[in-house]
Every structure is written in C-alpha cells, then in structure tokens.
Amino acid sequence: MLFNSVEFLIFLPIVFLLYWSMFRHTKAQNAFIVAASYLFYGWWDLRFLLLIALTTVCSYASGVFLAQYNDKENTRRIICTANIVLNLSILFVYKYFDFFADGLHALLSTFGIDSPHIRLNMVLPVGISFYTFQALSYTIDVYRRHLTPTRDIIAFFAYICFFPQLVAGPIERATNLLPQFLKPRQFTYQQASEGMRMILWGLFKKMVVADNCAVFVDSTFANYQSVDGGTLMWGGVFFAFQIYGDFSGYSDIAIGTARLFGIRLMRNFHYPYLSRDMAEFWRRWHISLNTWFVDYVYIPLGGSRHGISTTIRNVAIIFLLSGLWHGANCTFVLWGAYNALLLIILILLDKNHKHATDVAAKGHPVSSGG
C-alpha cells in the first residue's frame, strides 16, 4: 500500500477517525495502531507479517532478559549479541545471501574452480532494513542502559510496526518513539494541520517533482548512446532531484501522517543540496540512517578519537555498510566507496590535523535533531 495510492487514501481517514474515537484509552489506541499497521504491511504480502512479528517478539524478549540479568554483565552481553546476530541473520538471508552467493560463484569461476551456484531467490520483505535497524537500536540502547526496557508488549509492537515510517523511514530510536506510545495522546487541530501540510508537501515532492523528473531521466539514460553530453549532464541533474523528491517526499508524508496520530518523528532531510561540502551534505541527507551508523558503528569502532588513520578506516566502513544497506548490489557498494573517498579527501585536506578527525563526526551527527 503506497502513500500515493487510492488504497492509502481510503485507509488513512478510516484509521484516523477510529484511532481518535479511542482517545481516552491509550492501550486501545496502541492495539489499534498495531492492527492497522499489520493490515498496511500485509497488503504487500501476508508472509511479511510473520517476519516482522518474529523480530518484534525477539527484540522485546531481549529487553526483558536484559533487565532480569541487570547485574550480570556477561549474561547481558550474550543476550544483546544473540539478538543482534538473530536480526542481522534474518536481514542477511532475505536481502544479501544471493548477492554474496553470486559474487562468490563468480570469483571461484574466475579462478577456474567449479562450484554449485546456490541462490535462495527469496522475496525481499518491504521495509526490512528499516524495522531491523529500529529493533537493533532498542536492544543496544537497553544494553547500554540508555533506555529502560518496556514491559508493555503492545506499545513495543507499535514502536516497531508504526505504519507511517515502517517501509521508508525515518529510522526512529526507541528513546524518542517508544515513550510516545506509553503516554496518553491528545488530538489538537494544530498538530492535524501540521500533519496535513507535511503530507501535501511530501506528495508534491513525490508526484510533481520526482515523478516528472523520472520521465526525463528514464528517457535520457535509456538512450544514453544516442544523446549528447549536455543532455546526459542534465539527466544527472534531474536524477538528483528525482531521488531527493522521492525519498524526502516519502519521509515528509511519514512525518505528517504520524503527526495526525499525535506522534512526532525525527526530521530526515534538511535541504541537503544547499550544503557547502560533503561533510555538511551527510549531516543533512537521510539523517536517521547516518546518525544510526555513527552511534552504533562509527563511535564503537573508535570514531575519530585515535588519529586520522583510524578515522579514515571507520569512515570507509560506515560508508560501505551504508551502501550495502541501500541495496544488495555492486552499484551501491561503489556508491558507498565513492562517498567515503570524498569525505576522506576532505579529512586529509584539513589544514589542522588536530581537528581533521572531527570532519567525519560532523558528516554523521550523533544528534537525532533536524
């Protein structure tokens, strides 16, 4: 069920009216949000529901066990690691297994080694990268004692499957989103009008900007051999606006839809094409993903605290992972490597090496603010 579909146009007002008819009962609202979100998600494929339910139950249980063994650090470490491995294994099997299997088969064939070509050919569940990272952030934050684990399983289900941001982000943190499901929410005309403005602005970006740019982009690159260099250059410019309108448009619709239900989501894009350099660009582009990689990968690896060589290594790692996160394809890996190279050059060109290592952190802010 896409945001710009007739089905969603019917779905949203019905869910909105029924949700606010329960305004005196927070638990009932949460249960209804879960039911509506599962209907929304199951619209693509009912099989997806089993997978997201498994992720949710295991992540909820990990929080409960982490609280139960609060004074036993080794046990807590095992629980946290087990949940991370489980969630990443599910993500790997569905999204990355065939990519790495194809790569291994091609590599062995290059050296004349005959090997079976094993592929799973599994349907990729919509939004699995988003809700997996959201589930991981909960477990890690509870393990780090940045968050008290919840015993309210319905609220936790709502946190993982909240339909406005389920399939296209923003990737929310439990520290921001989960507490909003644990307290009463009041309807106000101000938040409803804010939500509608964001939805309309997002639809404009998606349907007017992105979709119209896509017509020119598709026709240009479909016949790239027969068009001149100037046209190809304009095709690249239009493609930049297409992906921005597409991605940020969906984020705006998600943020606006959440506001209709009294929920505030983080800002995901902040005029990225007005950035002065690559570091600032990555402060403004897909903020929720970039802050996730900083908090859970970059900083644990040492961040920029141990000199330029360590910083360069960590920047390369998070950008390669970011490329893989966007898609199981060599194109995305190269895209990640290209952006890593640009930021590494920026670090090396910094005149004051004492502060050069701050560039990477600036490019991927820790704050979840917009």
Task: Identify the role of each PLM range.
Residues 1-370:
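Membrane-embedded transmembrane alpha-helical bundles that form the catalytic cores
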